[in-house]
Amino acid sequence: MSLWKKTVYRSLCLALALLVAVTVFQRSLTPGQFLQEPPPPTLEPQKAQKPNGQLVNPNNFWKNPKDVAAPTPMASQGPQAWDVTTTNCSANINLTHQPWFQVLEPQFRQFLFYRHCRYFPMLLNHPEKCRGDVYLLVVVKSVITQHDRREAIRQTWGRERQSAGGGRGAVRTLFLLGTASKQEERTHYQQLLAYEDRLYGDILQWGFLDTFFNLTLKEIHFLKWLDIYCPHVPFIFKGDDDVFVNPTNLLEFLADRQPQENLFVGDVLQHARPIRRKDNKYYIPGALYGKASYPPYAGGGGFLMAGSLARRLHHACDTLELYPIDDVFLGMCLEVLGVQPTAHEGFKTFGISRNRNSRMNKEPCFFRAMLVVHKLLPPELLAMWGLVHSNLTCSRKLQVL
């Protein structure tokens, strides 16, 4: 072989060896190292759950459950981000053949048609709310059209604090919303909400309609969100947007409590019966709930719970079919865990006095002693807040803590 041919041959071999070495080196790197950015996460389609806790396809919700393989240890840790990105859930038309279903009122038929649609995409999210040392997360159920209520809360009891006092962490506030229930209003209110969220950065919103029966969706969406983004927050206060809250009393009450406790405190209703009168807002037909009474549950307005219990509550709720009354549904979830909610005199679901005309319902000295009072509209809330935090002299101090 001539010298020229030998030189060309050696050059080709060297180039081939270099190419193989570069290929091996590239394959040894992870995509994130090579591209300087992590690969996008693989999103699994969201599934609904039957009462026994087995995962099933939403379209097979009413069919017999099939055996499900045990989740891997990695899957049991739960998602690291909100993992529902699309809404693809059709009505369960199999119900139309059931005689008991055919006699139900339209709103209950609509609820049952889509009861298996459990989770929806997030439209507005603020995972940063739980970064750092957060002691108390204040969460308020609101409706997209009720900006005035959210604004009044931000100016009063929903004002955030850098410290809860006594070496405790921050107090942060979030509002929970769906979308406008009237289609013709949806675009307009969504634009206003986007501007509001740019101003305050305190709104969690999901892609379901804000209706009375969908308040239960708001409960389970928040619990799932909490499980993902707030794994270490010690305590949560959850309330409506028409209540008066005394944050000082809430924090004083929590001072001696431990986050590991089964703490669930509010105005607890025992042995409450389902309402069968069709003209009542809380009417429930026997076909939907046939028992004589509900499990104990905290009535409307607000309640306090430990963060560790809230995360267990998320998984307990996922073993039950949805129920159209959100407070009762949470009571059912607590029953699954074997946890009894605790009654406290500082939580007033029906005002300080059940007699709406009573002067007690407008007496600031009573409000100063309470934790939560339901219900007040924005002008009443602002006025009462000003009175409670004025140089008020009360003849005697109520002891409710």
UniProtKB/Swiss-Prot annotation:
One BP annotation, GO: O-glycan processing
One protein family per Pfam: Galactosyl_T
Domain of life of the organism encoding this protein: Eukaryota
Cellular component GO terms, alphabetical: Golgi membrane
UniProt-annotated stretches for the region Disordered: 35-62
Enzyme Commission (EC) number: 2.4.1.-
Gene3D superfamilies: 3.90.550.50
Compositional bias per record (Polar residues), positions renumbered to this chain: 49-62
Membrane topology: Single-pass type II membrane protein
Positions glycosylated per UniProt: N88, N94, N214, N391
Tissue: Expressed in corneal epithelial cells.
Record's subcellular location: Golgi apparatus membrane
UniProt keyword list: Glycoprotein, Glycosyltransferase, Golgi apparatus, Membrane, Signal-anchor, Transferase, Transmembrane, Transmembrane helix
Designated name of the protein: UDP-GlcNAc:betaGal beta-1,3-N-acetylglucosaminyltransferase 7
Lineage: Eukaryota, Metazoa, Chordata, Craniata, Vertebrata
Gene from which the chain derives: B3GNT7
